[in-house]
From Swiss-Prot:
GO cellular component, one term: cytoplasm
Binding, ATP: 11, 59, 87, 93, 104, 114
GO biological process, any: UTP biosynthetic process
Major place of residence: cytoplasm
Listed name of the protein: Nucleoside diphosphate kinase
InterPro entries documented for this protein: NDK-like_dom, NDK-like_dom_sf, Nucleoside_diP_kinase, Nucleoside_diP_kinase_AS
Organism of this sequence: Francisella tularensis subsp. tularensis (strain SCHU S4 / Schu 4)
Reactions it catalyzes: a 2'-deoxyribonucleoside 5'-diphosphate + ATP = a 2'-deoxyribonucleoside 5'-triphosphate + ADP; a ribonucleoside 5'-diphosphate + ATP = a ribonucleoside 5'-triphosphate + ADP
Phylogenetic lineage: Bacteria, Pseudomonadati, Pseudomonadota, Gammaproteobacteria, Thiotrichales
UniProt-listed CDD domains: NDPk_I
Length: 140
């Protein structure tokens, strides 16, 4: 088992539903520690840079608009196999395909408004964490 860090974003739809605490509880029950957190309303430029990997995809504009539609809660999670564990907690990208009891099955409305983002690999996790947090903002 490897201790890892991963970036998690609770998206505007889930923030609006007031389920931040319920999602945090799931992280903690799964053995993930929240070692950094901030609430932020992303600017269009911030969202475009964060999701730049998708800039040529047809959904890019809609994704950016959704991510700037309201505040998001951004956190760094740490724990054994944190990346895989967080992705398991999140469930499938499309909430209709997500297993019962996952965050997306319970709180997401659509493939676009799908409640959460989580890093998909160690290199992207490190990059995404650096995008939102300086070393002095992470306590782990």
């Amino acid at each position: 088992m490897t201790k890892q860090r991963t970036l998690s974003i609770i998206k505007p739809d889930a923030v609006e539903k007031n389920v931040i605490g319920e999602i945090y509880s799931r992280f903690e029950k799964a053995g993930l520690r929240i070692i950094a957190a901030k609430m932020k309303h992303l600017s269009k430029a911030e969202a475009e840079r964060f999701y730049a990997v998708h800039k040529d995809r047809p959904f890019f504009s809609a994704l950016v608009e959704f991510m700037i539609s309201g505040p998001v809660m951004i956190q760094v999670l740490e724990g054994e196999n944190a990346i895989a564990k967080n992705r398991e907690l999140m469930g499938a990208t499309n909430p209709k395909e997500a297993k019962a009891g996952t965050i997306r099955a319970d709180f997401a409305d659509s493939i676009d408004a799908n409640a959460v983002h989580g890093s998909d690999a160690e290199d992207t996790a490190a990059q995404e964490i650096r995008y939102f947090f300086s070393d002095t903002e992470i306590f782990g």
